[in-house]
Amino acid sequence: MAKGILERLREDVVLGDGGYVLELEKRGYVLAGPFTPEATVENPDAVLELHREFVDGGAEVIQALAFYGDREKLATVGYGDRVGDINRAAVRLARQAAGNRALVAGNLSMTWQFEPESPKAADRVRALLDEQLGHQMEVGIDFIIAETYLYLGEALLAVERGKRSGLPVMVTMSFEDKLVTRDGKSPAECAKTLIDAGADIAGTNCWRGPKHMLPLVEEMRRATDGLIAVQAPAYRTTDATPFFTGLKGFPDAMEPYQLTRHEMAEYARQAKAIGANFIGACCGAVATHIREMARALGKPTREPSRWKPDPTKPMSATEYYRDRRAHSKD
């Protein structure tokens, strides 16, 4: 039997996948703004291809594309009545791409329905999570990733509903311009509270680029002996605007802010040094980023063909400029 996520994490860091909705938007399959996952039924081949790119890059976990896949969010783009089709398709596609090479995580996310101190809103969130997770479990997932929570209160509801499944649960928070959640909780408080509530893995994802996320991971690591996850977007955020959704290019002109593969590899190395156990990426991270992160973490990845240059043959432009750069005194 294949090792589960918790067994793998006890042995070594685990490499996650990259971002989906912004990349699929760039490829013409997702609407900028809503970023809902109807592509799983409307353009399944595009989703499958992106999953496969991440697997080939070295990802050890593939997430079902079910971010913003609850009934209420899907209803904003006219797909509320297809919540079951979309979530089941999301898991099937992830499973098809993963094969026996990667684990498949179900996916839950913030619902925008949560209201602090409102039992009625909490029950509404519970119902949305239960429905979405139920459809995903019909197909079969290895564990649950609940992500991008701006309120610790809503994240705790994800822990509560996820643990009912009997599967391991990973829950990650997001932090905007302030170093606390919208309900005033620090990264340390979030990590400790989530682990104490039963989350198997706690951490942070999205919004903040690596430079502005890693200090939060360090704070979480100091707060608990539990497993810590980090999934940073591959965007260069600034001290003035530490969250990428606040940058002028968001949502559909983010190319100037994208980090290089080598910058994401350095992020992976730093995350491991801090003590993160699950290291993945988020919006803006494509297969080239994941491949370089895999190399940085000593993970296997599909490498290009092994070739040796023949000095008697003309060089290609790439070889020529690489050779010239190697001998340059600049």
Please give the residue ranges for each predicted region.
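Domain-level signal for soluble alpha/beta catalytic cores
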Residues: M1-D330
